[in-house]
UniProtKB/Swiss-Prot annotation:
GO MF annotation list: (S)-2-(5-amino-1-(5-phospho-D-ribosyl)imidazole-4-carboxamido) succinate lyase (fumarate-forming) activity; N6-(1,2-dicarboxyethyl)AMP AMP-lyase (fumarate-forming) activity
Sequence similarity: Belongs to the lyase 1 family. Adenylosuccinate lyase subfamily.
UniProt source species: Spiroplasma citri
Source superkingdom: Bacteria
Pathway: Purine metabolism; AMP biosynthesis via de novo pathway; AMP from IMP: step 2/2; Purine metabolism; IMP biosynthesis via de novo pathway; 5-amino-1-(5-phospho-D-ribosyl)imidazole-4-carboxamide from 5-amino-1-(5-phospho-D-ribosyl)imidazole-4-carboxylate: step 2/2
Cellular compartments per GO CC: cytosol
Oligomeric and partner information: Homotetramer and homodimer. Residues from neighboring subunits contribute catalytic and substrate-binding residues to each active site.
Keywords: Lyase, Purine biosynthesis
Function comment: Catalyzes two reactions in de novo purine nucleotide biosynthesis. Catalyzes the breakdown of 5-aminoimidazole- (N-succinylocarboxamide) ribotide (SAICAR or 2-[5-amino-1-(5-phospho-beta-D-ribosyl)imidazole-4-carboxamido]succinate) to 5-aminoimidazole-4-carboxamide ribotide (AICAR or 5-amino-1-(5-phospho-beta-D-ribosyl)imidazole-4-carboxamide) and fumarate, and of adenylosuccinate (ADS or N(6)-(1,2-dicarboxyethyl)-AMP) to adenosine monophosphate (AMP) and fumarate.
Protein name per UniProt: Adenylosuccinate lyase
Binding-site residues, N(6)-(1,2-dicarboxyethyl)-AMP: R4, Y5, K67, H68, D69
The EC number(s) this enzyme carries: 4.3.2.2
GO biological process: 'de novo' AMP biosynthetic process; 'de novo' IMP biosynthetic process
Catalytic reactions on record: N(6)-(1,2-dicarboxyethyl)-AMP = fumarate + AMP; (2S)-2-[5-amino-1-(5-phospho-beta-D-ribosyl)imidazole-4-carboxamido]succinate = 5-amino-1-(5-phospho-beta-D-ribosyl)imidazole-4-carboxamide + fumarate
Amino acid sequence: MIERYFVTEIGKIWSDENKYNTWAKVELLVCEGWAQIGLIPPTDIEKIKTNLTVNLPRMLELEAETKHDVVAFTRMLSETLGPEKKWI
């Protein structure tokens, strides 16, 4: 964003941190939907809810390595989970 047009509140909306936190919320909602129809066991969805964490520095590091934002994102989320990461 061009600095002279920067408004703090708008800048936060378009920040990488907000973008990846929103993506994580979507992932969690999808997992919750799958759990409701029985595709994800209740124990796994609870672990996902508890442990799903966005780590922006790690995300950017993985993105630099993979050259792909979605691959980096799913890897970053998976690092915060155990075997239940298969649902991400």
